[in-house]
Amino acid sequence: MEIYLDNLWDQVLERLQLQLSKPTFETWIKTATAEQLENNCLVIRAPNPFARNWLQKYYIKTIADVVHDILGYPVEIYLTTFLVEDSRKNDSGLIWSEHKSVNILGENLSIPKPLPANLNAKYMFSRFVVGPNNRMAHAASLAVAESPGQEFNPLFLCGGVGLGKTHLMQAIGHYRLDIFPHSQIFYVSTEKFTNDLIAAIRKDSLQGFREHYRAADVLLVDDIQFIEGKEYTQEEFFHTFNTLHEAGKQVVLASDRPPNQIPSLQERLCSRFSMGLIADIQAPDLETRMAILLKKSEYENMVLPRDVIEYIATRYPSNIRELEGALTRVVTYISISGLPMTVENIAPILNPKTEKLEASPEAVIKVVSENFNLSIEDLKGSSRKREITLARQVGMYLMRQHTDLSLPKIGEVFGGKDHTTVLYSCDKISQLQNSDLNLVQTIRQLSDRINFSSRH
């Protein structure tokens, strides 16, 4: 059948305008354009990656339902930020589309080639902001990417949470794949390495496990500090490391502390981890934090006043992940509310950095259980009900923020949970706060109550 794409999209916009609130329509829907209709696939272009992700998360089903209603048959919606060049579009803007029983992407559709599942597309060298705090780590990572297995092997990236270690590791992987697409680049967490080892033991397939990891051209292992206390994992990793190193393959490790400060680390592993280069990453200074925010806003096609950039940068001095999350939260809030982008308007939704007061684990548990109307036994139990799981994750997050307990100790407080569960919970709550303003408010209120209880 013949469809004028512009006319189709006009009809879609008319219907969505009636279904959605004006701020939602103006912010997210009106700014998008229909680019191509082919083989039952409608390509919609968003103005920037942030808008694309928002449409994907909240409105893609609504759009698909409206298009289905207009055309009389279902289509697959593909969201992109790329301008699609369609050789089949004629001078009048007409696209010929044949009704087919299956939804497939047209062969003329320009789609970026998929990345390996374990590499984040955002973690490229081009998107890494270099400052005094990370200059050596960046230079070493680039050198390793250009000539793996040579000067710095292993490269040991060391620094606190959210300072860019994972970004640099994955940037190395991307760089190698850009030059040699068939390179064997393995990026894994220590937890995954351990889990793969356990699975191999259970299935009596240790040889396959060893062959898999020792086939790597570049092995990137994140959070290597979690190898502490795992004797068999350390044994296997030692031999994997030796095999790769002797073959001239590159090993890159990341940790929140240097090798000699990882408890229960075998001396021979500590020696090997230290035989290359240990590159320390410190918290960024104010100018670097502002540069990070500016670069992120440029990639997302966002324009922010300098005073807003500086205000956000001053509120998050030590964690880049939190810094970027705050920017996302600010842009989301301004987009939804329709308010001008000013310091006065964004200040209430940024979690205030109040003086940290040491709280007892019991105080955190009490405040969280009361807020979610749950018993302490519920929080410490193993129920996977959604509301209990969320409360437990919030509790772990707040305990990490308000106490000096280690991850394993926090796990003990919550009924003997593993430290990896605690880490996952803390990361989960941090990520949710980037898009859930209600959760941001809840965390702020609970933090205030915990601080209040610590003073009295």
Curated annotation (Swiss-Prot):
Q: Which residues form the signal peptide?
A: none
User: Which named protein is this?
Assistant: Chromosomal replication initiator protein DnaA
Where is the protein found, in the record's own terms? Cytoplasm
Q: Which family is it part of?
A: Belongs to the DnaA family.
Asked if the Swiss-Prot or TrEMBL record annotates the protein with the keyword Metal-binding, the reply is no
Q: Where is this region: Domain III, AAA+ region?
A: 118-334
InterPro entries the UniProt entry points to: AAA+_ATPase, Chromosome_initiator_DnaA, Chromosome_initiator_DnaA-like, Chromosome_initiator_DnaA_CS, DnaA_C, DnaA_dom, DnaA_N_dom, DnaA_N_sf
Where mainly located? cytoplasm
Binding positions for ATP per the UniProt entry: 162, 164-166
Notes on the domains: Domain I is involved in oligomerization and binding regulators, domain II is flexibile and of varying length in different bacteria, domain III forms the AAA+ region, while domain IV binds dsDNA.
> What does the record note on quaternary structure?
Oligomerizes as a right-handed, spiral filament on DNA at oriC.
Q: Which GO terms describe its cellular component?
A: cytoplasm; plasma membrane
The organism's lineage is: Bacteria, Bacillati, Cyanobacteriota, Cyanophyceae, Oscillatoriophycideae
Role, per record? Plays an essential role in the initiation and regulation of chromosomal replication. ATP-DnaA binds to the origin of replication (oriC) to initiate formation of the DNA replication initiation complex once per cell cycle. Binds the DnaA box (a 9 base pair repeat at the origin) and separates the double-stranded (ds)DNA. Forms a right-handed helical filament on oriC DNA; dsDNA binds to the exterior of the filament while single-stranded (ss)DNA is stabiized in the filament's interior.
Q: Which NCBIfam families match?
A: DnaA
| UniProtKB keywords | ATP-binding, Cytoplasm, DNA replication, DNA-binding, Lipid-binding, Nucleotide-binding
> What GO MF annotations does this protein's record show?
ATP binding; ATP hydrolysis activity; DNA replication origin binding; lipid binding
Region entry Domain I, interacts with DnaA modulators: which residue ranges?
1-73
In this chain, the stretch annotated as Domain IV, binds dsDNA covers 335-456
Region annotated Domain II, chain positions? 73-117
